Amino acid sequence: MKTFVLLTKLSGKNALLTDIGSKLGDRPRSGLEWLNDLRKQCPEITFKAHFALMGYWDSMHIYEAQDEECAARVSMITRQHGAKEVETWLAIPYEKIVKIAEELGPGK
């Protein structure tokens, strides 16, 4: 399984505070609907963590999936559930990067 990081933004740059407030007020229900839809359409994924963020992105979800196609489905379903922006990263464990660097050797 590969590890992916899903970043989401609920509202656009120039959203009114009332728009943001209404989305946040409805977030527990809509978040549960999103998770249930993902579990139904992508049963092979396993979520590892969910975070609310203080910055450009509103939330970060770390999950494992078999491949990039599955990650693309997660991203598309997230957009269907109202996220204004979505970005997905493939996360490689640090130990694997170290191993790759060792295999390449110095100067290669």
Tell where the protein language model's regions lie, with residue ranges:
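A short linear hydrophobic-aromatic micro-motif
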Residues: E44-H50, V86-E87
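Structured loop/turn residues at beta-strand edges in well-structured enzyme cores
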Residues: I45, G55, H81
